[in-house]
C-alpha cells in the first residue's frame, strides 16, 4: 500500500516515538509511507536548529519513508489563540502540501491529536481521495476544554465549532482506532457506529531502552542523577498531567528522589513550587534525545505516569506507559480509569487516585521499602505485558490489517 500518514509531530521532536514507530513499522512491511508533518517546534514552541521555516521541505527517512514538512505557526505556550493558530496553520498548509506535493495514496492514516490533522485527508480533490483512517490519541474538543486553554464565551464557541468538526471527521472516516478501551463508550455517545471503532493501543520500539537492566549508582552518577531510591517522570510537563500533588507527596518523603525529565507549560510553576518550598529531593532536567532517554529510564527504580482525574483522561492511555513497561520498570501511576486498571491487572506497579496526596505518600513509602529484587520482578511483569500487547509486531499487525480492510472497502472517498 501507499500510505499517506498525517501527524503534526514527528522526529526530531521529543516524544514522537509513537508516530515514528508507526511510519517505520509499516515501511518495514514493504509499504510506501509518505509522512505529512510540520516543522519541529514541540515542546518549546521554537523551531529546532537546522529547520528554518519554509513553504515546503522534503526528507528521505528510509527507503520506504518520505517526510513532507508543511509550514506552521510555531507555538506551544498557554495562549489559546496561539495554540489554535499552531493547530490550524498546520492543518491548512498540510492540506496544500497534500494537493501539490504528495503522490496519490491508497489510504490516508491520520494521527489525531490535534483533530485539525484530519483536514488534509478530508479536503483533498477527488483525484487524490482515498479511504481515511483516524488513529485517535485523545478526544477533541474534550481534551481542549478540559485542559483549561479556552473558557467563557470564546471557549463555548470553540467547543461548539470543534464538536461539529470532529463529528464530521468521524462520519467521513472509514475506521477509527482508539488507544484505550473506554474511548469506545465516549465515541458511541457522540454517534459513532460501534463497527467503525477498533481497539488499537500504541506500541513503542524498545531499541533505545535497556530492559532488565538493574539501576546502578554508577549509571546515576554518570548522568548527574541522585543516588538512592529514585523515581522518575519523563514526558510532557503540562496541566493535564497533574504533577503538583505528587511533588507535594515527595516533599513528605525526603529519603527518596523524584526527577522530572521534560518540558511543558506547567514546568515553570512546578519549579517555582519546589524552589519556594525548599523541596530538596525533587529535580528537573530538560528533554532528552531518544538515544539518551533510555539511559535515564534505566537509571530509575520506578517510573511515574500521572494524569488528572477527568472523564476524558480516565479513557486514555498515555504512550509513556508503554515505554515504561517496555523498559521493564515498575510504575507508580497517579491516574484513574484505564491506566489504573492496566497497572492493577498486570501487577506491574501501584495505582493511586489522582490528587490524593496521602495515598501517593503511602505508595511512595511502600515502593521505597520494597526490595530491589521485588521491584525487578514487577518490572519483568510489566515487560511481559508489553510483549503481549504493545510490542511493535503486535501493533503493526493490527494496524496493517485495519488499513487493508479500509482500502478494500473504498468507503467515504
PLM feature spans:
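A short helix/loop element that forms part of the nucleotide-sugar donor recognition site in Leloir-type
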Residues: 51-57, 210-224
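Carbohydrate-associated surface elements
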Residues: 182, 203
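Membrane-proximal helix-turn-helix segments that form the acceptor-binding/catalytic region
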Residues: 99, 116-119, 123-127, 156-178
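N-terminal subdomain of nucleotide-sugar transferases
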Residues: 1-60, 248-251, 411-413
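Nucleotide-activated donor-binding/catalytic signature segment of Leloir-type glycosyltransferases, i.e.
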Residues: 256-262, 268-295
Amino acid at each position: 500500500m501507499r500510505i499517506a500518514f498525517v501527524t503534526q509531530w514527528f522526529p526530531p521532536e521529543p516524544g514522537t516515538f509513537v508516530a515514528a514507530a508507526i511510519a517505520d513499522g509499516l515501511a518495514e512491511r514493504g509499504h510506501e509511507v509518505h509522512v505529512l508533518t510540520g516543522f519541529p517546534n514541540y515542546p518549546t514552541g521554537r523551531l529546532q536548529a537546522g529547520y528554518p521555516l519554509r513553504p515546503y521541505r522534503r526528507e528521505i527517512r528510509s527507503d520506504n519513508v518520505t517526510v513532507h514538512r508543511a509550514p506552521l505557526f510555531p507555538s506551544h505556550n498557554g495562549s489559546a489563540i496561539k495554540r489554535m493558530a499552531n493547530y490550524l496553520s498546520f492543518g491548512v498548509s498540510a492540506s496544500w502540501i497534500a494537493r501539490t506535493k504528495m503522490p496519490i495514496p491508497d489510504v490516508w492514516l491520520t494521527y489525531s491529536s490535534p483533530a485539525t490533522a484530519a483536514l488534509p485527508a478530508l479536503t483533498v480533490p477527488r483525484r487524490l481521495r482515498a479511504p481515511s483512517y483516524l488513529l485517535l490519541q485523545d478526544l477533541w474538543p474534550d481534551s481542549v476544554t478540559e485542559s483549561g486553554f479556552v473558557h467563557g464565551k470564546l471557549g463555548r464557541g470553540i467547543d461548539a465549532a470543534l464538536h461539529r468538526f470532529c463529528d464530521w471527521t468521524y462520519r467521513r472516516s472509514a475506521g477509527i482506532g482508539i488507544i484505550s478501551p473506554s474511548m469506545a463508550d465516549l465515541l458511541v455517545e457522540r454517534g459513532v457506529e460501534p463497527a467503525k471503532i477498533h481497539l488499537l493501543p500504541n506500541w513503542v520500539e524498545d531499541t533505545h531502552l535497556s530492559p532488565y537492566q538493574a539501576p546502578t549508582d554508577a549509571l546515576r552518577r554518570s548522568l548527574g542523577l541522585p543516588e538512592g531510591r529514585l523515581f522518575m517522570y519523563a514526558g510532557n510537563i503540562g496541566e493535564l498531567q497533574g504533577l503538583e500533588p505528587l511533588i507535594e507527596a515527595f516533599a513528605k518523603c525526603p529519603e527518596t528522589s523524584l526527577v522530572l525529565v521534560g518540558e511543558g507549560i506547567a514546568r515553570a510553576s512546578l519549579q517555582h513550587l519546589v524552589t519556594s518550598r525548599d523541596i530538596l529531593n525533587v529535580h528537573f532536567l530538560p528533554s532528552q534525545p531518544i538515544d539518551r532517554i533510555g539511559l535515564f529510564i534505566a537509571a530509575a527504580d520506578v517510573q511515574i505516569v500521572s494524569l488528572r482525574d477527568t472523564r476524558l483522561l480516565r479513557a486514555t492511555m498515555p504512550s509513556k506507559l508503554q515505554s515504561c513497561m517496555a523498559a521493564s520498570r515498575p510504575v507508580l501511576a497517579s491516574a484513574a480509569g484505564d491506566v489504573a486498571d492496566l497497572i492493577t491487572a498486570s501487577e506491574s506497579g501501584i495505582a493511586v487516585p489522582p490528587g490524593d496526596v496521602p495515598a501517593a505518600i503511602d505508595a511512595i513509602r511502600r515502593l521505597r521499602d520494597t526490595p530491589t529484587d521485588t521491584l525487578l520482578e514487577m518490572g519483568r511483569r510489566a515487560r511481559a505485558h508489553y510483549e503481549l500487547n504493545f510490542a511493535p509486531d503486535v501493533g503493526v499487525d493490527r494496524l496493517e490489517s485495519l488499513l487493508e480492510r479500509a482500502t478494500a472497502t473504498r468507503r467515504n472517498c
